[in-house]
Amino acid sequence: MLVAGQFTLIPDSAFEQALINLGIDNALDGVVASSSISAIDTLIISNSNIENLEGISGFHSLTYLDCSVNNLDTLDLTVNYLTFLDCSGNNLEYIDISNHLALLTFKCNYNEFSQLDVNANTSLLYFECYENQLVSLDVSSNIFLTELRCNANQLSYLDVEGLDMYVLVCDNNQLTTIDNLSDNVSLKFLSCSNNNFYSLLLSAHPQLNWVSCSNNQLFQLDISSQAGLNYLFTWGNPSLNCINVSDVVVANATWSVWDGQSGNIDGHHYFSANCSISSVNEFKDCKKISSVFNMYGQETQLIKNTPLLYRYDDGTIQKKLILK
């Protein structure tokens, strides 16, 4: 038992020292008076060299916990009921937060998670899990989610069906598309650089203010519906030529060529109000097709009378419309 009579055991001296620094405890003796912690609702003990949070169960009223930047390998919060949790910057591989039904903010960046289960956290509004080892992420139950930052993982699939987020950051993954992105009509900030996107159609997101899609394999980019777009980064997409916009004059005046330190677009990119198939560079047909994608970046079969993206065995990509 962690709670022994009138005292709660705190075996980690760094944890207890953090409590002393906060005026919650008064002596480094391995225990804290249970009456001193039972009513505490907020505990910020970040960057304290803590290796073990045994004793946290004695904080019966705790709703806000920041234990980031410590040396935790495990974190047992099964008897707490949090609305805010930041456990970023530890060595965690597993965490059970299924009992935190009122959790609104969850930050677990810079850990070693390969999977996370947030299905029970249906009230979640803000979710950060970047710089982990996630190979999958299910947010289908988090219908109130407004901000998701899952960059720098190993995700090859991301479905945001039924959500309406304001912010989505998914850079540095292995994504070729984001399923049901169009559901998120309130999206204002999208950052998806350093992935494998072939196409990015954003007509369903007129409120976008920021789009960063650098270092992909984009062949098509349509930002013609984003009248309020102030920030655009498309460099590092060698197969992208024409960027569809509503006002070419404004686009040319707003965004400049990337020079290695600053800028927005590659030198061969240009803006047009009507990027057509004829604007695409033609390739020789002797190359072997390795895969075919639709305009949403999803792999598909050959379909006549439908514009598709053809990836060849030499790595080049071609947009073609094959007529009957």
Give residue ranges: language-model regions.
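N-terminal capping/linker segments that flank leucine-rich repeat
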Residues: 1-64, 101, 122, 143, ...
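Conserved hydrophobic beta-strand positions in leucine-rich repeat
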Residues: 41-43, 65-67, 85-87, 104-108, ...
